[in-house]
């Protein structure tokens, strides 16, 4: 059966196939979760039928090429008509498939804007995980995850739990990586992606891969599923970039339209300061500088408690940057281990992640 969400145009459907390619062979299975973008029930049924046929074809004729199979799912279907936001491959035919990679492929191919997976590495359904939850999202490259990232997480959680009606039991912390962050070399390196995923999962974190380069799009996405509190944790440089008008030229209302979508009623920014490694000067919400033309706009959000400073930080940890740690790992230099959370360096060494080579 089709399930309609609170939004009139949103209908969700689970679909899958359990199959064998040889007699007496254990079953393999492919399951999908789709979200319709069209309103007409008859059209939805026809679209679902077509995608079902494509799934059957893919299962029997493309099971050795699952990435290619994903592309076949949209044969004879308008891409704007349906979104595939979750897919899982299980069984003997797919023993070598990591479903996190297949989720990444959904975003890369434009089949969905965001996917999620849990600490156990299994894919999660965003609609279910985000529904009516308080959300704290921390964006980064996590290449690798450092003490600074973990400090941002812990301090954000501490601030949030002190807020009225925080309800920690109904809250979700998400470590978000954008598609552009995964394409630092111009193309997606799956091994590099899996290295990041393994580290974050080892720390017990829920991970989101998204195509939301702009923060306002991320905020819009969350607001589709929840009306509760949304908190975005970011560094000072990220907040300054948000006030760069070049990101909003595609919007008819420009930066004002974007900020209307970003700083809505229940959203706040938890701001982590930066330090000048040479002078030791700290920059926070009170001392950061934005374009003079936008200064009053920034002050409006600042004085309306939309930007909250993260305090009690470790100034030594603030000098740690993922890119520097990564360079040390690749060059085989010493000293990078103490810049990472407990247990992370051991995992990098044991699994030889991020190009680590034992001497």
What do these predicted ranges mean?
Residues 1-2:
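Short, well-ordered junction/capping motifs at the entry into regular secondary structure
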Residues 5-359:
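Nucleotidyltransferase catalytic core that binds NTPs
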């Amino acid at each position: 059966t089709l399930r309609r969400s609170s939004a009139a145009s949103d209908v969700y459907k689970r679909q899958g196939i359990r199959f064998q390619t040889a007699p007496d062979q254990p079953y393999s299975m492919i399951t999908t979760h789709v979200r319709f973008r069209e309103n007409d029930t008859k059209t939805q049924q026809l679209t679902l039928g077509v995608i079902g046929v494509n799934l059957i074809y893919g299962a029997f004729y493309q099971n050795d090429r699952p990435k290619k199979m994903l592309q076949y799912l949209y044969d004879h279907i308008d891409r704007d008509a349906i979104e595939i936001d979750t897919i899982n491959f299980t069984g003997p035919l797919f023993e070598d498939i990591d479903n996190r990679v297949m989720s990444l492929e959904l975003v890369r191919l434009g089949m969905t804007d965001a996917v999620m997976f849990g600490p156990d590495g299994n894919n999660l359904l965003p609609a279910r995980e985000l529904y009516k939850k308080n959300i704290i999202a921390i964006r980064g490259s996590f290449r690798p995850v450092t003490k600074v990232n973990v400090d941002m997480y812990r301090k954000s959680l501490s601030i949030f739990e002190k807020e009225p009606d925080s309800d920690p039991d109904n809250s979700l912390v998400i470590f978000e990586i954008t598609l552009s962050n995964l394409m630092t070399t111009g193309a997606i390196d799956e091994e590099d992606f899996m290295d990041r995923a393994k580290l974050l999962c080892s720390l017990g974190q829920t991970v989101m891969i998204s195509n939301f380069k702009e923060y306002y799009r991320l905020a819009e996405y969350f607001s589709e599923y929840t009306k509760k509190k949304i908190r975005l944790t970011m560094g000072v440089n990220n907040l300054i970039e948000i006030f760069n008008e070049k990101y909003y030229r595609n919007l008819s209302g420009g930066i004002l339209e974007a900020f209307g979508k970003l700083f809505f009623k229940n959203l706040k920014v938890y701001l982590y300061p930066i330090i000048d490694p040479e002078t030791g000067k700290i920059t926070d919400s009170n001392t950061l500088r934005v374009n003079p033309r936008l200064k009053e706009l920034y002050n409006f959000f600042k004085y309306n408690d939309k930007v909250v400073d993260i305090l009690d930080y470790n100034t030594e940890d603030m000098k740690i940057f993922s890119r520097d740690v990564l360079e040390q790992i690749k060059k085989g230099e010493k000293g990078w281990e103490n810049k990472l959370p407990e247990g992370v360096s051991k995992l990098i060494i044991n699994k030889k992640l991020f190009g680590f080579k034992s001497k």
